[in-house]
Amino acid sequence: MAKTAIAYKEKMKELSMLSLICSCFYPEPRNIAAYTFDDMEVKQLNKRASGQAFELILKPPSPVSEAPRTLASPKRKDVSLEEIQAKLEAAEERRKSQEAQILKQLAEKREHEREVLQKALEENNNFSRMAEEKLVLKMEQIKENREYYLASLMERLKEKERHAADVRKNKEQLELSG
């Protein structure tokens, strides 16, 4: 009895809910292992947990089917010498036009490169001139500061010399009077 219950449980797991409901209405099992379409038949070979396998059977072509049609290439019309010459001239004009367009694009590109180079040189010159002006101003400022510093040192030195002279003079007067 336990084996029957286990087998029933396994069968219930395999069946979908729709199959379960349908099995209540139709007690005999349906063969859902084969499906038929217009020109083929699909048979289910086996069903496993890892996947399913199918066999695809193509029906032979019916005798009424049409034979494959071969498409006839359109007839070539005779081309005159004038038409060939006109086509060649048009092709030559197209080629010349393309060459002229390419040359024009190259000239524009060269002109743009020249403008970019000129602008870079101009910016470089401006930068150099500005840097030189800044350097000259800085050097002038340093020179002025140095002159001011030296002048202040000389002034202090003169002040010390005057003070030393006053001290000597006072000392001499003390020695003479004393």
Swiss-Prot record:
InterPro entries: Stathmin_CS, Stathmin_fam, Stathmin_sf
Coiled coil ranges: 75-178
The SLD domain, residue ranges: 38-178
Membrane topology, from the record: Peripheral membrane protein
Source superkingdom: Eukaryota
GO cellular component assignments: cytoplasm; growth cone; lamellipodium; membrane; neuron projection; neuronal cell body
Gene Ontology biological process terms, A to Z: cellular response to nerve growth factor stimulus; microtubule depolymerization; negative regulation of microtubule polymerization; neuron projection development; positive regulation of neuron projection development; regulation of microtubule polymerization or depolymerization
GO molecular function, one term: tubulin binding
Pfam families per UniProt: Stathmin
Annotated localization: Cytoplasm; Membrane; Cell projection, Lamellipodium
Similarity-based family: Belongs to the stathmin family.
The name this protein goes by in its record: Stathmin-2-B
UniProt organism field: Xenopus laevis
